[in-house]
């Protein structure tokens, strides 16, 4: 009786895999023959330009990444400033209180 159950489970798994693979093929054929507003190839490979193989940029064309490539989908942002603190941040010390330790820390970094 256990042997029949194993066979039934194997048949069920095979049928599920067949249906799943059929759906993938069907979706691929629909994608291939449908019209879309964007190209289907998102990731573009940088191909070396054989005429410029001796240059410093390793011969890659600047037009290998047209605006419709994957990098065109990313939002444009402002450049990120350096993470090091500026002089303006270092001018302000701790506020002076009545204790001696706070007086030391307030004036120690200004020297």
Curated annotation (Swiss-Prot):
IDL5 is only partially redundant with IDA. The keyword Ubl conjugation does not apply. Expressed mainly in flowers. Lower levels in buds and seedlings. Detected in vascular tissues and in hydathodes. It comes from Arabidopsis thaliana (Mouse-ear cress). The lineage of its organism: Eukaryota, Viridiplantae, Streptophyta, Embryophyta, Tracheophyta. It is found in: Secreted, Extracellular space. This is Protein IDA-LIKE 5. Keywords: Secreted, Signal. May be involved in floral abscission. Residues 1-27 form the signal peptide.
């Amino acid at each position: 009786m256990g042997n029949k159950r194993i066979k039934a489970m194997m048949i069920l798994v095979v049928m599920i895999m067949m249906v799943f693979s059929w759906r993938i093929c069907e979706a691929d054929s629909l994608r291939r023959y449908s019209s879309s507003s964007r190209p289907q190839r998102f990731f573009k490979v940088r191909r070396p330009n054989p005429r410029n193989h001796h240059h410093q940029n390793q011969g890659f064309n600047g037009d290998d990444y047209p605006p419709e490539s994957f990098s065109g989908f990313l939002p444009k942002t402002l450049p990120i400033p350096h993470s090091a603190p500026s002089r303006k941040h270092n001018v302000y010390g701790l506020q002076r209180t009545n204790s001696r330790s706070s007086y030391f820390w307030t004036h120690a970094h200004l020297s």
